[in-house]
């Protein structure tokens, strides 16, 4: 009887959730929209249905999303990624081009169709093709929670981003060129606060606001602080945390914070809400770049707006490493499988600066990796079929996985893992650029926290390392990459193939997806080289440019030998002909001018003798 009642309750709860769940259907057509986000330079931004900024999408746990993305561009492919969403059982809906799907060509429509399962919180959506989200193809995605654990009166959404006056399609080629061998990232012209500058936020006294803060930029981390107000952090990347109050927040691109802000009871004045740029990420700071943005918390529209509220140091910014999950999830068991990756930036043989994981710069395969899994049969468990330049790792379902990331670069890097949240179990402090990088030592490391911080995007500090831990319980293909868009373009990415046999069992390519692949000219079967006859034959795959040779090459030796021979011949010619011709030249000049050289020489000798006698006489006349 008890078993029957338990089953009945479970069934009733399940049916109730189905009844409560909604299906959200959106039709969005991409296109260029006239805009002037920073109020300085009009340009076109990527909008949906002739509108920009893009709309905020709101759903609840259990709801279904049916988003039809119509490519309205004339000559650009596109895709859409739902950042932070697990999209369980629907990996084709994750979005990264040539990882989980074929790109959508102009004029075609792709249906993103998935159910929002076991997630709540603050997320976003953006193009995962080229630098399109830096051109404006980005928006907020919120999964509302009827059981939100903290009290608040009103919700507010706040986005941060960097802004360029030029299009990403123009900036990218100038960045990835031999004329930029150091890999200096393009510097934004401005930084936006809710897709504008000098924004105002109208508030009421004595209220608690839940503010969802998202950095939807493509490059620079930012700081946030307020005049005479505090942030109480309660959520990070969709994960609830124990309350933590701070005056200063540091937020990298792709990260999200949910904070409570309680307003004052008085309305006699207004206050400043500042955003500041992490200038350590810039190779140089132009004199005209405004690194601090001044925005306003407005209590009284009749009162004057205050001046900027600058601070002397960013040293007191909250370190998210110490945030504890509200769920009290303990440190997972020891890892079953460890992936160690070394981050480096270097120049290849074409003179261009690339980014590397373990000396491999990611190059997209000729068949999306997910479609290789679905078509490979038993070969899907062999990492080789996914290409030598995709940095692919095959994971066993249910394994605890550690990613050890050693950063040999002198800059910070925010890394995002698709399809999962992870525990950050260690992050070493930054090491100076003139010192050697510190790498993780499994036998000598800091004590790991009992309740590690959990999120989906986290940054590694310069010349140091971090260790991430997660459970491989979402069997699909996942991208792990630096979310500085320039670094992704340079190749800083890894592909995780999680339980390929389960993927084959649970996922089938949709007819819509097949059509998209056919229209864009991308095979939907085969290995990384698009070979569907022999999955171990990678001839013709996309590979990185060759490395610069070390030491002398054959061509270099030959060039050096010929250069030396030419130099010796030149010296010999100069010496032989120069010295040999002196006498002949003198004879020729004497004949031309009818000069008697012997008589001239006798006169010169007599003059020398007279000069010597004169000098001796002068010397004797000087006082001693």
Swiss-Prot record:
Keywords linked to the UniProt accession: Cell membrane, Copper, Glycoprotein, Ion transport, Iron, Iron transport, Membrane, Metal-binding, Oxidoreductase, Repeat, Signal, Transmembrane, Transmembrane helix, Transport
Residue ranges, Cytoplasmic side: 577-624
Subcellular location(s) per record: Cell membrane
Keyword Cell membrane in record: yes
GO CC annotation: high-affinity iron permease complex
Regions of this protein lying in the Extracellular compartment: 21-555
Domain Plastocyanin-like per the UniProt entry, residue ranges: 46-144, 190-292, 382-499
Membrane topology, from the record: Single-pass type I membrane protein
PROSITE patterns per UniProt: MULTICOPPER_OXIDASE1 (PS00079), MULTICOPPER_OXIDASE2 (PS00080)
Binding site for Cu cation 2: 83, 126, 483
Signal sequence annotation: 1-20
Positions of transmembrane segments: 556-576
Extent of Low complexity compositional bias: 608-624
Sequence positions that bind Cu cation 1: 81, 416
UniProt xrefs under InterPro entries: Cu-oxidase-like_N, Cu-oxidase_2nd, Cu-oxidase_C, Cu-oxidase_fam, Cu_oxidase_CS, Cu_oxidase_Cu_BS, Cupredoxin, CuRO_2_Fet3-like
PANTHER family xrefs: IRON TRANSPORT MULTICOPPER OXIDASE FET3, MULTI-COPPER OXIDASE
Protein family per UniProt: Belongs to the multicopper oxidase family.
Protein name: Iron transport multicopper oxidase FET3
Chain's gene name: FET3
């Amino acid at each position: 009887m008890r078993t029957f009642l338990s089953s009945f309750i479970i069934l009733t709860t399940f049916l109730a959730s189905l009844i409560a769940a909604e299906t959200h259907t959106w039709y969005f057509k991409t296109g260029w929209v006239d805009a002037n986000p920073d109020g300085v330079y009009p340009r076109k931004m990527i909008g949906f249905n002739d509108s920009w900024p893009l709309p905020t999408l709101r759903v609840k746990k259990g709801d279904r999303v049916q988003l039809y993305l119509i490519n309205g561009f004339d000559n650009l492919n596109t895709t859409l990624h739902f950042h932070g969403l697990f999209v369980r059982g629907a990996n084709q809906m994750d979005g990264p081009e040539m990882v989980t799907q074929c790109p959508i060509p102009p004029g075609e429509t792709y249906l993103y169709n998935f159910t929002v399962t076991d997630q709540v919180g603050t997320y976003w959506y953006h193009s995962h093709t080229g630098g399109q989200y830096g051109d404006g193809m980005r928006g907020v995605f919120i999964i509302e929670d009827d059981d939100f654990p903290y009290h608040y009166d009103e919700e507010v959404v706040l986005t941060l981003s960097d802004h360029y006056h030029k299009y990403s399609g123009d900036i990218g080629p100038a960045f990835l060129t031999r004329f930029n061998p150091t890999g200096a990232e393009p510097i934004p012209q401005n930084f936006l606060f809710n897709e504008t500058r000098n924004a105002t936020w109208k508030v009421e006294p004595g209220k608690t606001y839940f503010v969802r803060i998202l950095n939807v930029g493509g490059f620079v981390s930012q700081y946030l602080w307020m005049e005479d107000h505090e942030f109480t952090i309660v959520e990070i990347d969709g994960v609830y945390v124990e309350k933590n109050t701070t005056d200063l927040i540091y937020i990298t691109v792709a990260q999200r914070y949910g904070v409570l802000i309680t307003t004052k009871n008085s309305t006699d004045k207004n206050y400043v809400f500042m955003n500041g740029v992490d200038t350590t990420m810039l190779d140089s700071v132009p004199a005209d770049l405004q690194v601090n943005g001044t925005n306003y918390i407005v209590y009284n529209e009749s009162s004057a707006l205050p001046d900027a509220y600058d601070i002397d140091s960013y040293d007191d910014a909250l370190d998210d490493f110490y945030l504890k999950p509200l769920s009290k999830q303990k440190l997972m068991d020891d890892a079953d499988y460890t992936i160690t990756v070394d981050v480096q930036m270097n120049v290849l043989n074409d003179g261009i600066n690339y980014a590397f994981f373990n000396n491999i710069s990611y190059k997209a395969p000729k068949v999306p990796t997910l479609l290789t899994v679905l078509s490979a049969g038993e070969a899907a468990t062999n990492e080789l079929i996914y290409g030598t330049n995709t940095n692919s790792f095959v994971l066993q379902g249910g394994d605890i996985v550690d990613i050890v990331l050693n950063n040999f670069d002198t800059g910070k890097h925010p890394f995002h893992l698709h399809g999962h949240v992870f525990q950050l179990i260690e992050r070493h402090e930054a090491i100076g650029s003139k010192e050697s990088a510190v790498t993780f030592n499994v036998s000598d490391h800091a004590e790991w926290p009992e309740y590690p911080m959990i999120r989906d995007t986290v940054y590694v500090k310069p010349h140091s390392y971090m260790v991430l831990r997660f459970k491989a319980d979402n069997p699909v293909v996942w991208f792990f990459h630096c979310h500085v868009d320039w670094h992704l373009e340079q190749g800083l990415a890894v592909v995780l193939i999680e339980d390929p046999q389960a993927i084959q069992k649970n996922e089938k390519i949709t007819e819509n997806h097949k059509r998209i692949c056919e229209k864009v000219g991308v095979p939907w079967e085969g290995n990384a080289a698009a070979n569907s006859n022999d999955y171990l034959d990678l001839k013709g795959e996309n590979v990185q440019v060759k490395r610069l040779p070390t030491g002398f090459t054959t061509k270099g030796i030959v060039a050096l030998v010929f250069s030396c021979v030419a130099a010796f011949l030149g010296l010999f010619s100069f010496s032989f002909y120069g010295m040999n011709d002196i006498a002949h030249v003198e004879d020729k000049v004497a004949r031309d001018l009818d000069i008697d050289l012997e008589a001239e020489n006798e006169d010169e000798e007599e003059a020398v003798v007279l000069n010597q006698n004169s000098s001796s006489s002068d010397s004797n006349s000087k006082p001693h």
